[in-house]
Amino acid sequence: MSKVTVVGAGNVGATCANVLAFNEVADEVVMLDVKEGVSEGKAMDMMQTAQLLGFDTTVVGCTNDYAQTANSDVVVITSGIPRKPGMTREELIGVNAGIVKSVAENILKYSPNAILVVISNPMDTMTYLSLKALGLPKNRIIGMGGALDSSRFKYFLSQALGCNANEVEGMVIGGHGDTTMIPLTRFATYKGMPVTNFISEEKLNEVAAATMVGGATLTKLLGTSAWYAPGAAGAFVVESILHDQKKMIPCSVYLEGEYGESDICIGVPVILGKNGIEKIVELDLNADEKAKFAASAKAVHGTNAALKEVGAL
């Protein structure tokens, strides 16, 4: 029997759990939250759609009862607070690092063999913290960011091409942030051909720019962070792992020399299967792409340095 736990029953966590249930990715999905009644209520609400939508997955909610998460195959961590007005980056990292570290440690008490998928922000840094604090093999800790950024890239590509998003291929690597992500326009294809056969270089650059501010655009429209695509991206990553699909998905993973970087978690394409990260795929980047990746990694290293400043590592 397969089991997935989603920690954090906010918008992103609940959406992730809902997609996992609707697509019957696991036999059981457990939602855990610190706020009493929230995960229980959302789980009950989801289960009341089972007959309407025709799924058999069981969704259970609990308040801080990690025993209910026991023997999970995959655990998705969405816990943390959003950045508040006047809050420094270091303050946000200090708070979220404490939350994520505590959650991960509690999860491993009951599911020592679980694969962790990190969504909490700043995502690359929280993935790095989880790996360093827990001492798990690097194949078992995965940051979701690149899956979401690539999905947004494909959305904007499809809008420019006037086609379905499933007809295009596109990938975003680098840090999960609007100044650090790198939409790989050179690798983007439509019906197996370079998208530049169909749209101008100028239009393609506009697509890349829209992708980079995709999250900020939604925050401006919604007044809060997006949740449908982030939650679905988390579920997409979980499905490739749990069903051993061996999909190539850009995710934040620990590098040891790949792409010329070490001691960092950052977005690169990986093959995801039953062991988590089955393989890191090294693309043949050109000089411009390499320079952008190095700059992105430098920025992520800078954010990671704050972990030591706040005593999280």
Swiss-Prot record:
GO terms for cellular component: cytoplasm. It catalyses: (S)-malate + NAD(+) = oxaloacetate + NADH + H(+). CDD domains: LDH-like_MDH (cd01339). Its EC number is 1.1.1.37. The active site is at residue 176. Pfam families: Ldh_1_C, Ldh_1_N. GO terms for molecular function: L-malate dehydrogenase (NAD+) activity. Substrate binds at residues 83, 89, 121, 152. Keywords: NAD, Oxidoreductase, Tricarboxylic acid cycle. NAD(+) binds at residues 8-13, 33, 96, 119-121. It comes from the Bacteria. One of its GO terms (biological process) is tricarboxylic acid cycle. NCBIfam families: MalateDH_bact, PRK06223.1. Belongs to the LDH/MDH superfamily. MDH type 3 family. Catalyzes the reversible oxidation of malate to oxaloacetate. This is Malate dehydrogenase. The lineage of its organism: Bacteria, Pseudomonadati, Bacteroidota, Bacteroidia, Bacteroidales.
